[in-house]
């Protein structure tokens, strides 16, 4: 983290490869049932100050845009695991834990028609200048992998296609409350 400076500052802090492997063990044995992202974007100057002083930088990452592609690449291409693990830990289990199941968490009648169509072989690369967030400084700049969304559907409506937001869907978001 100290090598990358402010762009890598987040809470909890980035961990060693050994720590990451242990977290994967916990996901695979069910100890960790949910995997999520605390997307905390910052203006470029808040992350990448002139001195690259990690103590002065905003404590969050611009990462949500690549969260699913990163997970897909790690689960399917690197670890050779079934992609259903992603649906379980990023959708089904969180919906159950946070009380959204019945509206979110499954592709069933009566649930919101949310889906991501993903091309498992589509290459992707994190490029700071192409981020859609408030800031464009990220410690993941240059990271590459395979498996990228081609279409995102929320409540039956296409909101993103081929890596771009659909303008007509702007403002279609909805605050989700527990259904229990």
Task: Identify the role of each PLM range.
Residues 8-18, 57-63, 138-144:
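A short acidic, glycine-rich active-site loop
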Residues 10-13, 36-37, 155, 161:
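Thr-Gly-centered strand-to-loop micro-motif
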Residues 49-53, 109-175:
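C-terminal cap of metal-dependent C-N hydrolases
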Residues 5-8, 28-35, 41-120:
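His/Asp/Glu-enriched, well-ordered alpha-helical/loop segment
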């Amino acid at each position: 983290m100290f090598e990358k400076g402010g762009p890598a500052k987040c809470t909890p802090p980035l961990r060693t490869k050994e720590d990451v492997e242990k977290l994967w063990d916990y996901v695979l044995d069910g100890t960790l049932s949910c995997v999520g992202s605390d997307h905390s974007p910052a203006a470029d100057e808040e992350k990448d100050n002139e001195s690259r002083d990690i103590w002065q930088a905003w404590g969050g990452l611009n990462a949500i845009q690549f969260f699913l592609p990163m997970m897909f690449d790690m689960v399917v291409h690197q670890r050779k695991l079934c992609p259903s693990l992603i649906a379980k830990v990023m959708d089904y289990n969180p919906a159950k834990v946070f009380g959204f199941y019945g509206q979110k968490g499954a592709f069933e009648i009566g649930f919101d028609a949310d889906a991501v169509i993903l091309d498992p072989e589509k290459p992707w690369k994190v490029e700071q200048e192409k981020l859609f967030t408030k800031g464009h400084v990220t410690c993941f700049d240059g990271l590459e992998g395979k498996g990228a969304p081609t279409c995102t559907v929320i409540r039956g409506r296409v909101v993103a296609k081929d890596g771009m937001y659909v303008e007509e869907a702007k403002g279609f978001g909805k605050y989700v409350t527990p259904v229990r």
